[in-house]
């Protein structure tokens, strides 16, 4: 039972595209026993879906809209904390494989609670101790990774520019699968 998490920064002018890509990704990956947790964030944090079976996690236009500044670190920190609290209630053998997909437009960071250093430490800990697979996609992701103290815990990253975000996720997952088989 795998869990797919999407932390997705609001992208002005690309709302319809994001909704279509998200729903297509779910449809293409909907075979299997997967649960989806979807987090939308900007200057607010919206836990849209929590552990919802993949077939019921579609995104609709009234759910996805642009508001204010992006609090990327706060959204990632809250998502990790929320999922850890859920996993702590499960026996270790029952904890699902977790994939964290973070989409960001590379814009401002209005976070108030978490710092960049705190987030990189949390991400590395989740990957090292809990086996999470963590993927970044967005604008200027490589620059963000280069600025990190370490990014050993990141399983994939790619700048998207105008590429299909979820197509990039599929490629990252495929590369990850192939590297594990070698």
Q: What are these model-derived regions, one by one?
A:
Residues 1-182:
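Acidic, low-complexity intrinsically disordered regions
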């Amino acid at each position: 039972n795998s869990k797919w998490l999407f932390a997705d920064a609001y992208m002005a002018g690309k709302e319809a595209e994001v909704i279509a890509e998200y729903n297509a990704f779910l449809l293409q990956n909907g075979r299997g026993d997967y649960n989806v947790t979807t987090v939308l964030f900007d200057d607010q944090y919206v836990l849209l879906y929590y552990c919802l079976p993949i077939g019921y996690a579609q995104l609709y236009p009234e759910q996805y809209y642009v508001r204010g500044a992006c609090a990327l670190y706060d959204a990632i920190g809250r998502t990790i904390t929320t999922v850890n609290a859920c996993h702590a209630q499960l026996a270790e053998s029952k904890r699902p494989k977790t994939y964290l997909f973070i989409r960001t437009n590379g814009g401002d960071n209005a976070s108030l609670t978490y710092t960049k250093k705190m987030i990189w430490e949390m991400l590395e800990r989740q990957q090292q101790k809990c086996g999470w697979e963590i993927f970044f996609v967005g604008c200027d992701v490589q620059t963000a990774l280069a600025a990190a103290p370490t990014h050993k815990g990141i399983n994939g990253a790619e700048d998207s520019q105008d590429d299909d975000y979820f197509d990039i996720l599929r490629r990252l997952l495929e590369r990850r699968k192939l590297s594990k088989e070698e």
